[in-house]
């Protein structure tokens, strides 16, 4: 009788070892965890033109690598990052001016993302050497907040363009996402993006607005990575455009400053519910290494940048199952699905209006997260220096991006370099905050809320 009471208490309270639930329940929890991450993870490759199969494969592999690096102590899933969308779009636009197709230009963007991932390793080394707190003071919310706001605003026009293909289908997605997020209960509240996509996709299919021919022709089993879509394929082609390559790196790498702040916020947020200080053990330097190398490897093989997911925290709070093994099960399922081209074709067939509908909310939420980042960290806009830093970042990021040229271009020798507004704003903002007189604000990660750019 006593054993029965102990077992019931264990189920009702936090669970740190999911094996006590039995294998079937562990598998179900793993599938649930994957679906919580699924909506945003597959939406990024759909928006950018990258491979859905490669995305699932490297989301799973990156998650497993993160767990390996952190000693299997951190219950985190790595999925696709929305923060780099502007970088992908910018490189594709630059490639189009040179006569390159989207498929030909995307590997150049992947080079930039791979380099951005390496920046995580540099920060990890610095954190290990000098301590996380000393490093984060150079990236306070008055810098990262406006950058995040600009990311969302720059992406917003593409969402409207997608919605314009069929506003009724887009509205279904928007309404369902809002209803699930505001009035949903349990797991429904955790996966509003997935619910919005499924509902809108279903309505589009019923009304004849979906072309399933690609799904019919796709094989059930196949390799998730095509060599011609990878960075290796780019360099083996023998026709690399050096100017576009350098521009891609300069355009995309500064975005990592914002996503690294996102990483810190998410790791802090996970620490709260599981009642373990993950910043100290296994250490921020280890989680940064896992995220950074995961992003670099994914990009080299033509998959999007990875990021820690805020939905991850939501699922942990909902289920009270804090065992990292459950997250690893979700990773295994993601890898398994990546070898099914028919599944990827079903995702790719999704109407543009469905994508646009959920993107309106997602892109707006990115900007809202930037605002929240500053509010939660008590950024003082009574200080003139803070107003100037934020104003310059927003002015440069939006002004350059929406100017006639869309970038600031210059030549170094025979190499033409184009800097996006976001890249310029990030660099100038960090420098301004460092040199302007007055007391600088510090980054204070909130343990209850994360600033994820890869989540809803």
Residue ranges and their predicted role:
Residues 50-55, 72-85, 135-144, 189-195, ...:
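Short, non-helical or kinked segments that cap or interrupt transmembrane helices
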Residues 1-28, 212-238, 272-279, 434-456:
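Intrinsically disordered, low-complexity non-transmembrane regions of multi-pass membrane transporters
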Residues 1-78, 83-103:
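N-terminal signal-anchor module of multipass membrane proteins
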Residues 9-11, 38-41, 173-180, 191, ...:
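Juxtamembrane interface elements at the cytosolic ends of transmembrane helices
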Residues 89-95, 181, 312-327, 333-338:
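Interfacial segments of multi-pass membrane proteins
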Residues 105-213, 331-447:
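Membrane-embedded alpha-helical modules
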């Amino acid at each position: 009788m006593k054993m029965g009471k102990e077992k019931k208490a264990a189920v009702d309270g936090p669970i740190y070892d999911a094996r006590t639930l039995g294998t079937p329940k562990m598998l179900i929890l793993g599938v649930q965890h994957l679906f919580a991450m699924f909506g945003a993870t597959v939406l990024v490759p759909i928006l950018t033109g990258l491979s859905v199969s490669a995305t699932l494969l490297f989301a799973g592999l990156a998650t497993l690598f993160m767990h390996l690096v952190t000693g299997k102590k951190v219950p985190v899933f790595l999925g696709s990052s929305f923060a780099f969308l502007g970088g992908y779009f910018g490189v594709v636009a630059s490639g189009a001016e040179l006569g390159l197709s989207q498929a030909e230009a995307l590997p150049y963007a992947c080079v930039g993302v791979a380099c951005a991932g390496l920046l995580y390793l540099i920060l990890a080394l610095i954190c290990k050497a000098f301590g996380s707190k000393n490093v984060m003071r150079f990236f306070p919310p008055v810098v990262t907040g406006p950058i995040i706001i600009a990311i969302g605003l720059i992406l917003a026009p593409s969402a409207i363009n997608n919605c314009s293909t069929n506003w009724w289908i887009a509205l279904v997605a928007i309404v369902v996402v809002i209803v699930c997020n505001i009035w949903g209960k349990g797991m429904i509240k955790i996966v509003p993006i997935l619910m919005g996509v499924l509902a809108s996709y279903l309505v589009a299919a019923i009304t004849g607005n979906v072309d399933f021919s690609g799904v019919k022709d796709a094989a059930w089993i196949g390799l998730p990575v095509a060599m011609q879509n990878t960075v290796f394929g780019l360099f083996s082609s023998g026709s690399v455009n050096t100017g576009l390559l350098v521009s891609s790196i300069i355009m995309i790498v500064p975005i990592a400053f914002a996503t690294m702040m996102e990483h810190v916020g998410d790791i802090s947020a996970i620490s709260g519910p599981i009642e373990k200080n993950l910043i100290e053990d296994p250490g921020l330097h280890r989680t940064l290494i896992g995220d950074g190398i995961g992003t670099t490897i994914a990009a080299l093989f033509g998959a999007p940048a990875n990021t820690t997911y805020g939905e991850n925290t939501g699922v942990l709070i909902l289920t009270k199952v804090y065992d990292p093994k459950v997250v690893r099960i979700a990773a295994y399922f993601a890898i398994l699905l990546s070898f099914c081209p028919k599944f990827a074709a079903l995702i790719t067939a999704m109407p543009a209006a469905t994508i646009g509908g959920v993107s309106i909310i997602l892109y707006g939420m990115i900007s809202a997260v930037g605002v929240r980042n500053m509010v939660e960290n008590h950024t003082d806009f009574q200080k003139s220096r803070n107003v100037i830093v934020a104003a310059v970042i927003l002015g440069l990021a939006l002004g350059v991006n929406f100017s006639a040229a869309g970038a600031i271009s210059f030549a170094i020798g025979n190499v033409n370099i184009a800097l996006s507004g976001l890249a310029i704003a990030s660099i100038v903002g960090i420098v301004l905050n460092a040199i302007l007189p007055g007391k600088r604000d510090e980054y204070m990660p909130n343990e209850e809320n994360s600033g994820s750019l890869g989540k809803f």
